[in-house]
Structures are given as structure tokens and as C-alpha cells.
């Protein structure tokens, strides 16, 4: 990770960002490259969970946020509004990072009840994602750690905390 300052994400749309970027100059004969792994977190989630509907959306090169919006808001794909797509994007990435109904409600300026319904509909749409995430929480609680795609163990000591909020955090990071 890169922070204070985050040199991995220097703004390009602001004049100050453009000025800062000018100080990075490659050695003679070399170039800098830029790689954007489009929706990499969601693609990995599709692979790890084995959710057929999510995998199919990627195989067919569909707009995953519009596809999710269509499913979650029960509207035909061609009728998904920009707001619905934006909200679905927040749900898609929020799920990956363990967002709660409270967190989603804050992000989208909606009620907790609505946010909870969005999350529930997401898991109805992509049930294997729910099973996969639940299995990670179960593993974390039983073993005190979860295992990454490459076999790295990530300890989650929060599961043993007497503090409810800490245990909830453990579930989100699992």
C-alpha cells in the first residue's frame, strides 16, 4: 500500500496532480507503463466463489455493475439507470470489502433497511458468493486465520475479542 502521500494514485485530472507526475522520469531507454486490472477484485471473487452467474457475466463481457443493478433492482438490463448502476457498483465493491448495511447506507445516503435489502438481493443474485464469504468467516472463527488464493495465512485475532465491534470487523476482513 502507498499512503501519506499515495504515490500510486496521483490525480491526473487536477493541475497539481499533473505537475507532480512530471517529476517521475524513467531512465534513458526505459518507459513507465500503466496497468489497470479492470474490476480485479470482482473477477477474483467470481473465480474463488465459483458463482456461475458472476462468471458468466464476465465471460460474456457484460458490464458487471449494470448486470448487478438489473438483478438487484429487478429491471431489464437496458432500463438500468446511471444511479442504479452507481449503487450496484457500490454494492459490488462493498461486498468484496465486507461492507455492512450501515456502511452501505452511509455510502449511498439511503436507509439501513434499503441497504440491507440491496445486500440481501445481491446474495440472492450471486448465492455462491455468500457461501464463499460465509466459509471464510467460518474458517477464520475455527482456525483463527483465513488462507489466501496463494496459500498465505492471514491471522484474524479479532474473532477472539470480547468486543462485539472487533468481532464484526473480523468477519468483514475474513
Residue ranges and their predicted role:
Residues 70-174:
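Conserved catalytic core of nucleic-acid polymerases
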Amino acid at each position: 500500500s502507498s499512503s501519506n502521500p499515495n504515490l500510486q494514485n496521483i490525480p491526473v485530472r487536477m493541475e497539481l496532480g499533473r505537475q507532480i507526475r512530471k517529476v517521475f522520469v524513467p531512465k534513458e531507454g526505459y518507459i513507465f507503463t500503466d496497468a489497470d486490472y479492470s474490476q480485479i477484485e470482482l473477477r477474483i471473487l467470481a473465480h474463488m466463489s465459483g458463482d456461475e452467474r458472476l462468471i458468466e457475466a464476465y465471460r460474456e463481457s457484460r458490464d458487471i455493475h449494470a448486470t448487478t443493478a438489473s438483478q438487484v433492482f429487478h429491471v431489464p438490463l437496458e432500463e438500468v439507470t446511471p444511479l442504479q448502476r452507481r449503487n450496484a457498483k457500490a454494492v459490488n465493491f462493498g461486498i468484496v470489502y465486507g461492507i455492512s448495511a450501515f456502511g452501505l447506507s452511509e455510502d449511498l445516503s439511503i436507509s439501513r433497511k434499503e441497504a440491507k435489502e440491496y445486500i440481501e438481493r445481491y446474495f440472492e443474485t450471486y448465492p455462491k458468493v455468500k457461501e464463499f464469504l460465509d466459509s471464510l468467516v467460518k474458517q477464520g472463527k475455527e482456525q483463527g486465520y483465513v488462507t489466501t488464493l496463494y496459500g498465505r495465512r492471514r491471522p484474524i485475532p479479532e474473532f477472539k475479542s470480547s468486543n462485539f465491534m472487533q468481532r464484526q470487523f473480523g468477519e468483514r476482513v475474513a
